[in-house]
Swiss-Prot record:
GO BP field: hydrogen peroxide catabolic process; response to oxidative stress
The protein's name in its UniProt record: Catalase
Active site: 65, 138
UniProt keyword list: Cytoplasm, Heme, Hydrogen peroxide, Iron, Metal-binding, Oxidoreductase, Peroxidase, Peroxisome
Organism: Helianthus annuus (Common sunflower)
Amino acid sequence: MDPYKYRSSSAYNAPFWTTNSGAPVYNNNNSLTVGSRGPILLEDYHLVEKLANFDRERIPERVVHARGASAKGFFEVTHDITALTCADFLRAPGVQTPVIVRFSTVIHERGSPETLRDPRGFAVKFYTREGNFDLVGNNFPVFFIRDGMKFPDMVHSLKPNPKSHIQEDWRIMDFFSHHPESLHMFTFLLDDIGVPQDYRHMDGSGVNTYTLINKAGKAYYVKFHWKPTCGVKSLLEEEAIKIGGANHSHATQDLYDSIAAGNYPEWKLFIQTIDPDHEDRLDFDPLDVTKTWPEDIFPLQPVGRLVLNKNIDNFFAENEQLAFCPAIIVPGIYYSDDKLLQTRIFSYSDTQRHRLGPNYLQLPANAPKCAHHNNHYDGFMNFMHRDEEIDYFPSRYDPARHAEQYPIPPVRLSGKRDKCVIEKENNFKQPGERYRSFSPDRQERFINRVVGGLSDPRVTHEVRSIWVSYWSQADKSLGQKIASRLNVKPNY
């Protein structure tokens, strides 16, 4: 075999998927899990390689959420939820915790206008007495996909064409035509709320399902929701074009100027909880990030308030070097087996190490404000002053000991390791319900945006037909209206 014949080039692409080392990949859609809903296994080398490779594609700009603005403030507990969690920073009403928050757009570059139709990031870093807690979410409560295996592909489809560097609807429509679970997210993105007026007037959500654990060790699934006290306001197309044309940094400036003027943005934090023992009663999977939890069944419970009362001192140090990761939690809060969350746990820290270096948590914006100690030494850009002689554990010469044990979810797992989809997909019910909740004029604007994306000349008749079928399954009249405007026959 000529070792140079198949040098790295797209001219020598294999007809099937492989790893970087050339091994065949038989499933490029699902992660390797314990059973259909269990945790993802680290031995899924293809997943790890795929995510690790993806995390290193751009430097030094964030691969997503590149365009952002930050501010500092505090979180104050207003309601007692100690029956649900033993988290120290939630121990009693009145307790305040310093925070730094970063808002962002998701897909577009660092200098792009803040008036583009795009999800918005809403990430909060709590500097607690028991270490940092990063609640890394968006302004929408759902996401496009439910398995992180598809995250690199999803972002690639939303990013500009690699040949022309132009974002094109035909690529987006093609990719998501393979993923009907994305419909719910599109009912948010293509709705009137798809372009927030600014960062102060938008909701926030933890998006993923986490777990709360109380002192007795009882666990509850939890969703986090931020609600702005000044209300939600959005821009329609004409307004967005006008504002973005005049100032491509209007949301950043609005946030900065409002805080400087003493008009401090504020959000209320609410949670929804589900007893894991009762999840089988639902017609959806509570660990499915493409679903919301009905508020009439799982009401919003108030927790506290977030106030941003101080602008950052340096954009590079407290925005570009500010790094979040869903893996950073505190006692009383834990992960769930949400497949997207499980992959975010790895991917976020990995991309920060790539972007900022292995010691990114030593940077002032990312470092905990409480005492901390471990044997993680040296590495690139290590600037922590250390004079210990003991860099191992245990030792009779160093009094450092284990921390007191705290409760974690008491979960037993069994199942066949496999790459598979969840059992309760139920992709169309919630998108249909959300569409029917819109007023007639709001429905019309939504339909116009859907049709606009599908009207790209390179969107094939096959892809249009698939989308008409999807929207028809969500709501028959919606599918008929889209089909009529696209001249596509509905296929029920």
